[in-house]
């Protein structure tokens, strides 16, 4: 296909147009008084959202050059979302500001490479300043609640629920967000290890009202193959009957004949037993069985280690304070495994999370880590309509990511104040030449933009508020929700330092690439062939 090439100002102006179109659509959502954006969907009701990255991902422009500009800023939002989970609108606003002022300087004759070097120097200084302003969150639930509330657009209910979930599952725990059946938003915490396999036969049920099997202080047998013949298990089963304790069997599967024998023995009352299939598949199954074994102090009986089911001894069995099995899930509470072995296993999984490049693998490893270390909480998001539920779910996701980021790197004053407090760090900074110094000035001006946009969205004059906040110190800032100037940290208006840092780093990175662009290549639009002439109009040549 033929290509069309544009150079210099022609190229950059068209790219800038695309940047502005996308950024203007995204930045209306910034701050507590930011507006919603409605997105058309091919099927079903339109989506209403206040999430910057969701808006950005929907935008495709007709002009290929403008679209490339929009895609660059979309990349800023996506990368910020991937790394920090929030701050996508802030990153977009910063990118637009750096590109806008930078482009004017390039047009006036500044060297783009020197500008980029100056921008990078300034960003490093601002990042240092953000780190110095940061306050550790630790286990301060009030601060966690504030972060969640701000990211959920000031929704106190969501803030409280996330703080409650965090308190229960701790730092390593996993919190997932799901749609509720009703209109209430609730949190449900699963203590201990839960995996998505239920009993193989309903005849194992001990509580017929709840249709659950509940065992106190049971033994747990873990086998990685199919149990075909029950005689292999007889020595263990006989000892179970003598001890009076229950047995949970976790195996790849159980043959119908062996299962029938187990059920008959269970119904006659002599044997307290329940069988479930092993969770996961392939290598992940092996890893999960090993996790269960370490948690319960047992051993995985596997032929890979030269073990056979008939050779199983009592000391190979794990145990736990309580086991609950329903038709879908098995939950093991307070496994009696060795604490040091569990810690060592947690360390191994953390190391794997660090090294893996696959998002899917990372998610599964995180789940395994949570099951061993903290537990799993599920936030069920409810709302009167599906449209509202999806919008609320977006906000809960943002709040959750922001809270995790705050626990990692602490919090800084919110409302764009952290950026303004970094300006003094840039005052004495000079570049190696005039253009580098101009790059530093560009960043100094751009980091005022998030506060200016928050104020504009609240219907006030941005320049006036920015000047007043700059005159203050520390966490003094403008609370757009209440329309007062106050200490934002005390008022609970705080942002995660990680989100604030990553938003600026990503914005500056893409803006630097943009300013140093000299040529843009796009597919040439092919002219559609003219439709054939109607043969009945042949005698009309003399008409004017």
From Swiss-Prot:
Enzyme Commission number: 5.6.1.7
Annotated residues for binding of ATP: 29-32, 50, 86-90, 415, 495
Matches recorded under PROSITE patterns: CHAPERONINS_CPN60 (PS00296)
UniProt keywords, alphabetically: ATP-binding, Chaperone, Cytoplasm, Isomerase, Nucleotide-binding
GO molecular function: ATP binding; ATP-dependent protein folding chaperone; isomerase activity; unfolded protein binding
Enzyme class: isomerase
Subunit-structure text: Forms a cylinder of 14 subunits composed of two heptameric rings stacked back-to-back. Interacts with the co-chaperonin GroES.
NCBIfam families according to UniProt: GroEL (TIGR02348), PRK00013.1 (NF000592), PRK12849.1 (NF009487), PRK12850.1 (NF009488), PRK12851.1 (NF009489)
Family indicated by similarity: Belongs to the chaperonin (HSP60) family.
Record-given protein name: Chaperonin GroEL
Native organism: Tannerella forsythia
Lineage: Bacteria, Pseudomonadati, Bacteroidota, Bacteroidia, Bacteroidales
Gene name for this UniProt entry: groEL
